C-alpha cells in the first residue's frame, strides 16, 4: 500500500521564531515511530504540514493523521478532504484518544493511546477491508521495538536569520508514563502510571546513529526523564562517554537526589 502519514499545521503555519516555532520544528515523533514500524512491503510518505504542503491528489491507499488539541481543527479538515476523495483515514494522538466519538465524525477509524504494537494489524485491516471503528491497544510492556526501516532522527533547528548557524539536533523518546497523577496533566491517563522505557543499549545505539548523521544536540522527549530514578542513573552514566548536549523534562525533586550530578555529568563532558 501507499501510506501517507500527516502532521497537521499548528495554527497559521507562519514560519519564523515565535512562541510555537520550537514545537513546529520538532519532527512528529509518533509518525516517525510508525514509519519505522511499517513493513517494507508498503510505501510511506511523511508530510509535516508546518513545513510542506499536503498534496491531496496523491494516490494514497490510506492516510494516518496525528494531532494534539491545538492541531485538531486542521486535522479534521485534512481528514475530511481525503475522505471526500475516497481515501481511508485513520486518526490517532492525545485528543482523539479522549474523544473517539468526536473523531469518528471525520475519520474511518480511531487508534487510541499508543499504536506501536498494533500498527501492522491496522495496516492489514485496511488492506483486507476489515478496518475497525476504534482500536484500544494495551500499553506496550517494552519500547524496544523491532524497526523495519531506520528513520532519521535528525532535524535542523530553526534559527533567526541574523544568526549564521545551522544546528542539527535529534529527537529520541526514551520512556513513557509517569508515576504521578497531577490534575493538570494528561500523561498518566494517556501513557499510564507505570513507567515503560527502552533498554540502555537501545538508547545508546540511537544516540550513536544520530551522531553519525551529524546531530550535535539531543531532545529527549520524555515527560519525566527521571520518573524511574534507578533507570535514570543508569541512563546518565551511559550517556557520559557519548559526549552530547541534551535537553529534557523532569520533576523538581531531582535536586533532592545525587541523580542531578549524573545528569550534569552526562552533558558537561560534551565536545
Label each PLM-derived region with a short phrase.
Residues 3-6, 200-271:
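Conserved SAM/AdoMet-binding glycine-rich loop
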Residues 1-213:
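Acidic, low-complexity intrinsically disordered segments
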Amino acid at each position: 500500500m501507499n501510506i501517507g502519514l500527516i502532521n497537521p499545521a499548528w495554527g497559521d503555519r507562519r514560519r519564523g521564531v515565535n512562541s510555537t516555532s520550537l514545537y513546529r520544528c520538532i519532527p512528529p515523533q509518533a509518525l516517525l515511530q510508525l514509519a519505522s514500524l511499517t513493513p517494507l512491503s508498503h510505501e510511506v510518505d511523511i508530510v509535516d504540514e508546518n513545513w510542506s504542503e499536503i498534496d491531496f491528489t496523491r494516490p494514497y491507499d490510506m492516510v494516518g493523521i496525528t494531532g494534539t488539541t491545538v492541531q485538531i481543527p486542521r486535522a479534521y479538515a485534512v481528514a475530511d478532504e481525503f475522505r471526500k476523495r475516497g481515501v481511508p483515514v485513520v486518526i490517532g494522538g492525545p485528543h482523539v484518544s479522549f474523544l473517539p466519538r468526536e473523531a469518528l465524525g471525520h475519520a474511518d477509524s480511531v487508534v487510541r493511546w499508543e499504536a506501536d504494537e498494533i500498527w501492522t494489524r491496522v495496516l492489514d485491516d485496511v488492506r483486507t477491508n476489515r478496518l475497525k471503528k476504534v482500536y484500544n491497544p494495551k500499553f506496550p510492556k517494552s519500547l524496544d521495538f523491532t524497526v523495519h526501516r531506520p528513520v532519521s532522527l535528525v532535524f535542523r533547528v530553526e534559527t533567526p536569520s541574523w544568526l549564521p548557524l545551522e544546528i542539527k539536533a535529534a529527537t529520541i523518546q526514551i520512556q513513557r508514563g509517569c508515576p504521578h497523577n497531577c490534575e493538570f496533566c494528561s500523561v498518566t491517563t494517556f501513557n499510564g502510571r507505570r513507567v515503560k522505557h527502552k533498554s540502555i543499549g537501545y538508547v545508546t545505539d540511537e544516540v550513536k546513529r544520530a551522531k553519525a548523521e551529524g546531530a550535535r544536540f539531543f531532545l529527549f522527549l520524555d515527560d519525566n526523564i527521571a520518573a524511574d530514578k534507578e533507570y535514570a542513573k543508569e541512563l546518565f552514566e551511559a550517556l557520559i562517554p557519548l559526549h552530547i548536549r541534551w535537553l529534557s523534562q523532569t520533576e523538581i525533586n531531582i535536586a533532592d537526589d545525587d541523580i542531578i550530578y549524573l545528569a550534569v555529568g552526562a552533558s558537561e563532558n560534551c565536545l
